[in-house]
Amino acid sequence: MFDIGFTELIVIGIVALVVVGPERLPKVARAAGHLYGRMQRYVSTVRSDISREMQLDEMRRVGQDFKQSVESAASGVEQQASVVDDYLRGEVDMLDKSVRNEPQNAQTPPQTADAEPAQPDVRQQTLPLEEPDQNRAAGEPSSTSTRPA
């Protein structure tokens, strides 16, 4: 803090001895030591406060930068969402128009001269029906029946 060498300290001690006197010199030296300690604590407190404020300012700047980047990303996402929304609305409108026009086209199907009228499929699907087996009725076990426990 102070650049005081050994010789300068001896000169200060001799001057203090002459000015204060030998009886009061220990009390004055003790008081000067206490004042010097208080001054050092005060200086260290001020340094730590300044350091803390600088860190706080830096954190505020980082927070503001982060907030700006998040806001810009959010606005970009909102822009993309509005573009997609506009595109989807256009597609829905186009599909709506095509669905509205389709019933009109379905009411008047195109007639062709060579086209045969469509005949419904009248074939009936036959399912095989099995006659009950006489052996099963007599009590013989089959491979598909369950055995009693």
Swiss-Prot record:
Q: Which InterPro entries match?
A: TatA/B/E (IPR003369), TatB (IPR018448)
Q: Where are the transmembrane segments?
A: 1-21
The answer to whether the entry has keyword tRNA processing is: no
**What does UniProt give as GO cellular component?**
TAT protein transport complex
In which compartments does the protein localize?
Answer: Cell inner membrane
Q: Which UniProt keywords apply?
A: Cell inner membrane, Cell membrane, Membrane, Protein transport, Translocation, Transmembrane, Transmembrane helix, Transport
A molecular function (GO) held by this record is: protein transmembrane transporter activity
Q: What is its main location?
A: membrane
Q: Which residues form the signal peptide?
A: none
How this chain sits in the membrane, per its record, is: Single-pass membrane protein
Biological process terms from the Gene Ontology for this record are:
protein transport by the Tat complex
Q: Which domain of life is it from?
A: Bacteria
Specify one Pfam family. Answer: TatA_B_E
Q: Which family does it belong to?
A: Belongs to the TatB family.
Role, per record: Part of the twin-arginine translocation (Tat) system that transports large folded proteins containing a characteristic twin-arginine motif in their signal peptide across membranes. Together with TatC, TatB is part of a receptor directly interacting with Tat signal peptides. TatB may form an oligomeric binding site that transiently accommodates folded Tat precursor proteins before their translocation.
Q: Which PANTHER family match?
A: SEC-INDEPENDENT PROTEIN TRANSLOCASE PROTEIN TATA, CHLOROPLASTIC
Subunit info here reads:
The Tat system comprises two distinct complexes: a TatABC complex, containing multiple copies of TatA, TatB and TatC subunits, and a separate TatA complex, containing only TatA subunits. Substrates initially bind to the TatABC complex, which probably triggers association of the separate TatA complex to form the active translocon.
Please state what the protein is called.
Sec-independent protein translocase protein TatB
